[in-house]
């Protein structure tokens, strides 16, 4: 009897072989050659390129990004030969999507674009002009989730699966509330405008507000419902974050009328995290993604801190993955690296790259998130979907 290897869907995402008893496929995860994430380089001149590049800034070669191999390939007439197969540019390339798809991909869309459930109408050219920036942040999020080994079940595969509604309050005149409900993350494209987003950040007293930050926060709500699969896990979560069954609407009213409690800095990562246990989990999850994503980038570039310069016994060498490391190693590396990044930002006249403190209770919460992520099972899609509706909680909306 022959063994079946990993299968590749038309959008370029590899799934595990079907379970021998059920015939069902496991949730999707990236596979890299030799288990190492390749560096983004132009295949022609070998210069480093940004993940969102459509052309090489050095040699001007047209590029397409292959999700499975995590590499750029040269594109000619919208096609590239990859591992002996013909791949095509995503049909959303006009909105700056540089990912590649197989010929049979639904509507010619890549895996990341398939996750977008709603977007502005085609005649809303102003809003669509802002879509590219948000989609870029979303692709970066999807790449990181795959690198962490987290299951991604699309909204069009199962009810409660992950999806995105990317709408615009500026062009429609209707209010768009950023939030999460039953797997669907809603974002306001108006926040891709720097002046609009910065005005909101100042008005709300937030030290950090970006589209990627919104995505990482809202996906934290999604994964709380996915990764906490039994009552024991929920009990452990409640011991750290509080009881999520408390009234969410009452919490909103209390937070916006009274603000965060005095001394919140000793137990929470942000003022918003104090509002409700749902938000504390999502904020902590977002910071876990901030930390691991930044350290992985530093590792990929080759940035490290010399021991002698920093009065340490050993160099600080960030890792691309902390899956096999205790959270204490992750946070120790981050303590040192974040201080260095903050100094670099200040040298350019900017605010701190990471303007947050991590008190002991927050570190314990991050340890809980780390354990959840590093032990996330690649469960079958149906099992993940069944776990979502009962624990999805209320719609989480933030202003």
What are these regions, as identified by a protein language model?
Residues 47, 273-399:
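Pan-zinc metallopeptidase signature
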Residues 224-279, 285-295:
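Post-HExxH zinc-binding segment in Zn-dependent metallohydrolases
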Residues 195-215:
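Short pre-active-site segment immediately N-terminal to the catalytic Zn-binding motif
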Residues 129, 133-194:
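Auxiliary, metal-adjacent structural segments of Zn-dependent hydrolase domains
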Residues 60-70, 113-122:
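Short Cys/His-rich micro-motifs in 6-15 aa windows
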Residues 42-45, 56-59, 90, 110-113:
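Short cysteine-rich clusters marking metal-coordination/redox-active sites
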């Amino acid at each position: 009897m022959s063994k079946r290897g990993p299968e590749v869907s038309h959008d370029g995402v590899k799934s595990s072989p079907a379970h021998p008893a059920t015939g069902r496929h496991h949730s999707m995860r990236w596979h890299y050659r030799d288990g190492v994430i390749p560096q983004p380089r132009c295949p022609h001149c070998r210069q480093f390129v940004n993940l969102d590049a459509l052309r090489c800034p050095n040699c001007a070669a047209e590029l397409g990004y292959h999700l499975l191999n995590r590499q750029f390939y040269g594109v000619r007439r919208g096609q590239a030969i990859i591992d002996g197969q013909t791949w095509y540019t995503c049909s959303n390339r006009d909105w700056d999507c540089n990912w590649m798809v197989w010929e049979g991909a639904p509507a010619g869309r890549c895996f990341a674009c398939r996750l977008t459930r709603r977007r502005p109408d085609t005649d809303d050219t102003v809003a669509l002009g802002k879509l590219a920036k948000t989609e870029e942040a979303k692709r970066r999020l999807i790449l990181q989730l795959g690198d962490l080994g987290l299951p991604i079940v699309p909204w069009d595969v199962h009810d409660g699966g992950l999806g995105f509604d990317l709408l615009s309050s500026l062009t429609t005149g209707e209010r768009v509330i950023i939030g999460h409900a039953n797997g669907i993350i809603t974002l306001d494209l108006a926040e891709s405008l720097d002046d609009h987003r910065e005005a909101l950040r100042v008005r709300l007293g937030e030290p950090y507000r970006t589209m990627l930050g919104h995505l990482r926060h809202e996906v934290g709500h999604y994964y709380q419902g996915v990764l906490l699969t039994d009552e024991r896990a929920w009990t452990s979560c409640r011991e750290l974050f509080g009881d999520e069954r408390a009234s969410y609407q009452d919490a909103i009213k209390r937070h916006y009328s009274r603000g965060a409690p005095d001394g919140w800095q000793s137990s929470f990562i942000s003022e918003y995290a104090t509002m409700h246990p749902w938000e504390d989990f999502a904020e902590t999850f977002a910071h876990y993604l901030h930390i691991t994503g930044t350290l992985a980038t530093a590792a990929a570039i080759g940035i490290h801190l010399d021991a002698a310069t920093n009065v340490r016994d050993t160099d600080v060498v960030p890792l691309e993955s902390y899956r096999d490391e205790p959270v204490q190693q992750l946070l120790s590396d981050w303590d040192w690296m974040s201080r260095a990044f903050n100094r670099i930002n200040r040298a350019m006249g900017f605010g701190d790259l990471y303007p947050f403190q991590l008190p002991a209770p927050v570190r314990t919460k991050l340890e809980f998130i780390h354990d959840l992520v590093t032990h996330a099972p690649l469960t079958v899609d149906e099992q993940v979907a069944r776990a979502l509706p009962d624990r999805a909680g209320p719609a989480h909306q933030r202003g």
